Amino acid sequence: MATPTSVASSASRDMVQRIHRVTRENRHLWYQLTVLQQPERARACGSGMKANSDRRPVDPPPVVELRIIEGPSVEEGKDITFDYNANFFLYASLEQARPIAHGRVQNGATNNPPILTGVPASGMAYLDRPTEAGYFIFPDLSVRHEGYFRLSFSLYETTKESKDFDMEPADSDLPAGVDWRMEIKTQPFNVFSAKKFPGLMESTSLSKTVADQGCRVRIRRDVRMRKRDGKGSGYDRREEEYARRRTVTPAPAEDPMRARSTSNASEHRAPYMPQDSQRRPSAAESYHAPSLPHAPSLPHAPPPPAYDAPPPAARPGHLQFGGEQNMPQYGGPAPPRSYAHPQGAPIPPVTPTGPYPTASAPSPYPKHDSQPYSYGPRPPVSSASPAPPMKHAGYDSRPSEPYAPQSPSGYTPTERRPSFVSYPSPAPMTPYIAPPAPSPARHMPTQSSLAPLKIASLVSPLPPIEAQTEPLPPPPLLPTGGKRKHDYVFSQNTKPLHNGQRQLDAHFGHGYRGLTPEPDQGLYSRADGQIGVVTFNQYQV
């Protein structure tokens, strides 16, 4: 007669359990249960309807492995777990890890309180990883009360073939073919209250391996454990939150531009002539005027026609500094002149608006003959209104320095040019208005080889940039076809009543109460309480 026998295979009976049984056909089968994943902690979920909604499972979920080996011994036998034709399920129960001394009055509810909830039974899953075997997984087990417990798993087998039945049934209470095989227990674990629970841990590699093969296991990644060492005040928590958000302000980088020197050693140098400017030219500077005929090889070059000759050796006023000089104020371009300078006559000094040097110097241009020189016919340029006269920038007369025209800018170098410029609309033909002089930061590379630009004569003014259309009026509100509101129709019900007043009957107005209408008129009441009058047709059929 073959009966199940419990055999301890290791020093720890809580980790691996084996039994041996002999079937009706004298087959020697070995059952080996191993708890691969032990539970470590749990949170007490309590009792009641609220406990079912906020229930935390035992962490990590217990995983039990089953192997069936056929042979005279485990070492010499063959693993037939996948070939054995039977059904297995594992039932979990909870028990106290420490013995509890009970009182004198004891009853069934006190001895075995129902504190384990969830799904306590699990069927066997045949998995290939981590090894080919049968696995029982318990992802939904919870404990209602806090304490120190351990889980006990009972293995039940439902044999399908009669040849695999036992020689004699071990338990007569179970139906034929259903047998209890063995039991294994886990290591003790703590069940914490909601306040003391440290939190769920990150899922183990075994849980992830089992979940990858289709088993229902909750996977948690990047779990943040709660710290309950010390509970600071609300002010401390706000300070910590602010410290986490606060970032270190980077140190300001050193300014690559050095400070302006106060030396006057560069006053007698020639004006700076930039050969290659990296800045983007403005609209006036980027325009290239067509080449005009000139004769640089003539012995006597004519003076610039109909244009104020720039002052000789015009140093940029914004580069003058020192103790004996004051910072100049820039002015706009000078109004046009309709005459040329006489031959050999020096240019009269311009009266400055500020403390400028007034020493006069001979003109740097060579003397010319009085022969007229023309550039050909040129149509007049239209303008809306003559430009207001603007003061010419001051300059120092130095006969030894080359010619460099000044800028038309009437603002300091730190100002910013406006983004949009409103141009006047064109008008009838008016006399020619001279354009502003070139910028002080933009100098001519030669002395008199290029004729001055006349951009105003080549570029026509643009129309003013204004809004062409006004904003459209809002569309009228169209009737939606819905019903009118009750307060709109029966507005008399919304008025307050004082001193015993009563609501007026809207169907009997003051004007028609107790009055009889005319013979050719009729009265009718509308839905809003107003009394309407209709006049009948005098003609009768």
Curated annotation (Swiss-Prot):
Residues 222-447, 464-483 are annotated as: Disordered. Residues 299-314, 345-355, 425-439 have a biased composition (Pro residues). One of its GO terms (cellular component) is cytoplasm. A motif (Nuclear localization signal) lies at residues 40-45. Keywords: Cytoplasm, Nucleus, Sporulation, Transcription, Transcription regulation. Its main location: nucleus. GO terms for biological process: sporulation resulting in formation of a cellular spore. Gene3D superfamilies: Velvet domain. InterPro entries: Velvet, Velvet_dom, Velvet_dom_sf. It comes from the Eukaryota. Component of the velvet transcription factor complex that controls sexual/asexual developmental ratio in response to light, promoting sexual development in the darkness while stimulating asexual sporulation under illumination. The velvet complex acts as a global regulator for secondary metabolite gene expression. Controls the expression of the gliotoxin gene cluster. Plays a key role in mycoparasitism. Component of the heterotrimeric velvet complex composed of LAE1, VEL1 and VEL2; VEL1 acting as a bridging protein between LAE1 and VEL2. This is Developmental and secondary metabolism regulator VEL1. It comes from Hypocrea virens (strain Gv29-8 / FGSC 10586) (Gliocladium virens).
